[in-house]
A protein has these predicted regions:
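Active-site histidine-anchored catalytic micro-motif
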Residues: 1-140
Length: 140
């Protein structure tokens, strides 16, 4: 069994956004040479996420609205105790918790083995600085 690792780096100018990283992950799988195995993609920051969903703009807007309703941005220390530490991003931690840290996708015949409409996304909830995503491939 072999393994292969790469890191993707993002510096998203918006506070919250979703970026389709499927093509980048497909290219990393191709470079790995793995034909049968698994790829793990995980956000290496506690205010970012990697998740699988449909690449439909209306759905993305729905997610942003829903997440903002569940955990509204409020930098004051009144709403979130975390912000009493001098931080202003407690909402981003909650949004990441909802959307998840990582995804694992099967590699079959050297390709990502998705269901219909599935795509891999990087979710940013506290943007404007560099963050990384680990892409780890294991298999044969």
């Amino acid at each position: 069994m072999k393994s292969y690792t790469e890191y993707l780096t993002f510096n998203v100018p918006a506070r919250m956004d979703f970026i389709n990283i499927t093509r980048q992950v497909e290219e990393i799988v191709r470079k790995s040479g793995v034909q049968e195995g698994l790829v793990l993609c995980n956000a290496m920051h506690i205010t970012a996420s990697v998740f699988i969903n449909d690449d439909e703009p209306g759905l993305h807007e729905d997610y942003k609205k829903w997440l903002e309703e569940l955990a509204p941005f409020d930098p004051s220390p009144q709403r979130y105790k975390h912000n009493r530490t001098g931080e202003d991003n407690a909402d981003a931690h909650h949004k990441r918790q909802i959307m998840g840290r990582e995804v694992v996708v099967a590699i079959t015949g050297g390709k990502l083995d998705f269901g219909p409409w599935e795509q891999i996304f990087y979710g940013e909830f506290d943007g404007r600085r560099k963050k990384r995503v680990l892409v780890k491939i294991i298999g044969e």
